[in-house]
């Protein structure tokens, strides 16, 4: 327990018999409960978990292999039932041993202090850096960082880090039926939390890599995740325009994005665009300039929506 919060850890595991025991046995003492989800393992993971049946703080779930997103969601929902009348923080920690348990206290600290509702681990700002991270992962993380920043309306430098801490307030409002469970799960959470007006903080976590290899096919991954982020980005802005959370920033961002698309699509233009093109400025440049302006307004809208949510919450308590 930390402050007024019980601490739960969600550990998704699929074929992790080589690493899972160490992950469980090195959990910090302040952890009140750990939910280990065996997601269709074909090795000895399930047998290993039987060694912890007598433990009061280790709980296990068995899934048929629904994927890591579904496993994490199941763990969050288990904690909601376990502590339905208590304040708690749910930490996601992979079962592959690539997350340092010593970083957990830094991860939950911003929530305990009341500075945010969600904390994301950031391997790029850790003192040890990301020297252990494979080069292709660094490049992929940088690209996805840009896309996630644009889609969420706030700066995100390590979107793919799965080491996170979530306040129970978020979990009690989350739409579990519509929750994204495929590739891009952490990106979806950031974008959707921005849409709901929750504050996101970042905490340094160590980059640890062993002998594990990823089975992700890069091109299909980028296509699927990129498409999801583009769709969720537009859904986020449209939902604000159609709700009582509309702000001047949102309107200006929508106008700027519209100008950008108008410059890019043939047969659609404005007098200003025709004048700029006539002066030798390429339509693509106009598009990216308009989108850059839109992103600035979008970030302002994101901050305003967060303030509106906090003000509404304060009025409810008054």
Identify the function of each model-found stretch.
Residues 38-47, 97:
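A conserved acidic beta->alpha catalytic loop
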